[in-house]
A protein has these predicted regions:
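PLP-dependent enzyme catalytic core of the Aspartate aminotransferase-like
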Residues: 2-3, 362, 366-418
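A glycine-/small-polar-enriched, mobile loop at the entrance of the PLP active site in fold-type I
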Residues: 19-75, 80
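Active-site C-terminal subdomain of aminotransferase-like
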Residues: 29-30, 205-310, 314, 416-418
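Conserved beta-loop-alpha segment that forms the PLP phosphate-binding cup at the N-terminus of a helix
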Residues: 70-98, 102, 106-110
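Active-site phosphate-binding strand-loop segment of PLP-dependent enzymes
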Residues: 131-186, 199, 207
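Conserved active-site segment immediately N-terminal to the catalytic lysine
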Residues: 193-205
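Conserved PLP-binding catalytic core of the aspartate aminotransferase-like
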Residues: 318-351
Length: 418
């Protein structure tokens, strides 16, 4: 008698992903060192080796974030988990939050804040532009928010929002300052303490050379004080010495940063079972960056990003957005007239094993996004991508000088001493 629930034989074979060079806006090809670290065997969540690994990871990410914040830790989940944990822990229903939007991920901050019950006030820029400090200050004066929430690098537009003057401004007006730096950290300058940020969340899958699945965050003393007013200890683990905060309990159990801090702190109050393999991977991502040196990594992203950008421009393609505010690690180019954008992406993937990105919303079908980030911010990856893209575009009838992209990139590398 056949088993109705027996899966097809194909489903019982191992999954073997095809070889790919991920040159889109993320995720990227993971550094082999990170994959090796993630293959290590698990230990128990209260094993001294495990808690030491957690403490070491906190210390490493303080250097990544350029901060002395005690509460620098990991949220188990994608970069969006870090965003949600920060916003739901800082915002109570009715709180006012100001979100400057210059791409898709500003809209994401708005949606999550609205789901927290906050009053969301938006200011918007045309995609491809960024805000001046004066525009944001005017909005802060008008709205008087509890929190300014802003993306630093938005991969949907490739733009990098200047943050360096916003922290002092927020401090002056009594506003908490949060940034999602998932797409930018490690490839562009980011100074948590110098820029007076109160909360930052990131992911591993861009310039940090890792897979999605862990979200490093850091919290200032001011942010921690706000969260601790809402502190809550679960009934099943609390003792007589535990006291809850006086504020409204955080609506999410999983993303309750007060409880997560108790788990990462000395008392190790049980909250969840740590995603041990992701912890190993996140630790190795930080180690790789800090061994290279943060400034050296940023310079590497600048050089390879410049080579890719100028190589694409030399192939008779128009660059998207304000180039003076572009991230080092991703560039947008308009799809040339008469060229089938998805057919080009398909040929790049199927014929060359290279992935480049499309875009979202008002830019969908109008631009490609090409990344040079993390492990793929390398000369060979840039040149391979330019060679493949030229071959595909020429078959689509796009006019350009033969080898122009690669020649220009090689000129840039010569200028940069590579």
């Amino acid at each position: 008698m056949s088993d109705h629930f027996q899966p097809a034989a194909r489903l019982l074979t191992p999954f073997s992903p095809p070889p790919r060079l991920l040159m889109g806006p993320g995720p990227i090809t993971v550094d082999p060192r990170v994959l090796r670290a993630m293959s290590a065997q698990l230990v128990g969540q209260y094993d001294p080796a495990m808690t030491q690994c957690m403490n070491d990871t906190m210390a490493l990410y303080r250097s990544v974030f350029k901060t002395e914040n005690q509460w620098t830790l990991l949220i188990d989940g994608t970069s969006r988990a870090g965003i949600e944990a920060v916003l739901i822990s800082l915002l109570e229903p009715g709180d006012k939050v100001l979100v400057p939007i210059f791409g898709r991920f500003g809209h994401l901050l708005c949606e999550i804040a609205e789901r927290c019950g906050a009053q969301v006030h938006r200011i918007e820029k045309t995609w491809g532009d960024v805000f001046s400090a004066e525009e944001i200050e005017a909005a802060i004066k008008n709205v008087q928010p509890k929190l300014l929430a802003i993306v630093q690098g938005d991969t949907s537009t490739t733009m990098l929002q200047p943050l360096q003057h916003l922290g002092e401004m927020c401090e002056r007006y009594g506003v908490l300052f949060y940034s999602d730096a998932t797409a930018s950290i490690g490839g562009n300058p980011f100074l948590t303490d110098d820029w007076k940020l109160d909360a930052v969340s990131v992911g591993l899958q861009k310039c940090l050379c890792g897979p999605s699945g862990s979200a490093p965050i850091t919290l200032s003393d001011k942010a921690v004080k706000t969260i601790c007013k809402r502190r809550h200890i679960e009934a099943g683990i609390r003792n007589e010495h535990h006291k809850d905060g006086s504020g409204l309990r955080i609506a999410s159990n999983y993303f309750d940063l007060g409880m997560i801090m108790d788990y990462w702190g000395e008392e190790r109050l049980n909250h969840h079972t740590e995603a041990t393999t992701m912890l190993y991977g996140a630790r190795e991502c930080a180690r790789i960056l800090l061994e290279e040196g943060v400034d050296n990594a940023i310079e590497r992203h600048r050089i390879h990003g410049r080579a890719m950008t100028e190589g694409l421009a030399a192939m008779n393609m128009k660059l998207f957005g304000d180039q003076s505010h572009k991230m080092h690690n991703v560039v947008g180019v308009y799809i040339p007239d008469g060229v089938a954008g998805e057919a080009v992406r398909g040929s790049m993937l199927n014929d060359f094993g290279i992935e480049i990105g499309t875009s979202f919303g008002p830019l969908h079908g109008k631009i490609w996004r090409v990344g040079t980030m993390g492990y793929n911010a390398r000369k060979d990856a840039v040149l391979q991508t330019l060679v493949a893209l030229e071959a595909v575009l020429r078959r689509q009838g796009h006019g350009m000088t033969a080898n122009a992209g690669v020649d220009r990139a090689l000129d840039i590398y010569s200028e940069e001493g590579l």
